[in-house]
Amino acid sequence: MSGHSKWHNIQGRKNAQDAKRGKVFQKLSREIYMAAKSGGPDPLGNPRLRLAVDKARAANMPKDNIQRAIKKAEGNSDEHYDEVTYEGYAPGGVAILVEALTDNKNRTASSVRVAFTRNGGSLGATGSVAYMFDRKGYIVIDRSTTDADEDQMLMDVMEAGGDDLQTSDDAYEIYTDAKSFTAVRDALEKAGYQLAVSELTMVPQNTTPVPADKKEQFEKLVDALEDDDDVSNVYTAAADEEE
């Protein structure tokens, strides 16, 4: 694996997300609602809902908000959202994937297209960049919550079935095959680890450095996409600055 660190990016964007907390919770509520609507209200029997709830908890979404979204799905609400993926290139030729949950595909497609166009990117056709990413399980353990050293952590990750362990001063990052993610997550929790993040994500097979003269425009594009009410996730193949 490339050594691409999602945790570095997550931490780097945390303050910006905190400022948009209301919008983040609204998006998470939508994900929880659709997961519960399609697979039932019990996270233990609904893997998609478990993922949505874990994601909400990682974002410090209040328990009442989570329960409200599940209750709404159990009720008579006829709201429906479609999952849509958009693909393209950011400034500097960096591949970018956008996942959305929308009740109006035309509106969302238009908004995403405008974001790309206004910020130096180009929206591509379906399949234009998706093949450059792999679906992976992603787990983060904050090192302040465990006494395990790197050797112990590696042993436990391998025993649980994880594919890759990356370490930094503040966190252990674990990547798994998408199909084995649930088993790895459950095994690590059973071993007593507290998981700061546990999710399915898209990981680039290779990363591309963002040219210095394109960095500001690149960040504006990502911000514009993440600000869209319908956009759930934005994945890029941008190399970390330290790579």
From Swiss-Prot:
It is found in: Cytoplasm. Residues 1-22 are annotated as: Disordered. GO terms for molecular function: DNA binding. The keyword Transcription regulation applies. Its main location: cytoplasm. Keywords: Cytoplasm, DNA-binding, Transcription, Transcription regulation. One of its GO terms (cellular component) is cytosol. Transmembrane segments: none annotated. It comes from the Bacteria. The keyword Cytoplasm applies. One of its GO terms (biological process) is regulation of DNA-templated transcription. HAMAP family: Transcrip_reg_TACO1. Belongs to the TACO1 family. This is Probable transcriptional regulatory protein Ldb0677. It comes from Lactobacillus delbrueckii subsp. bulgaricus (strain ATCC 11842 / DSM 20081 / BCRC 10696 / JCM 1002 / NBRC 13953 / NCIMB 11778 / NCTC 12712 / WDCM 00102 / Lb 14).
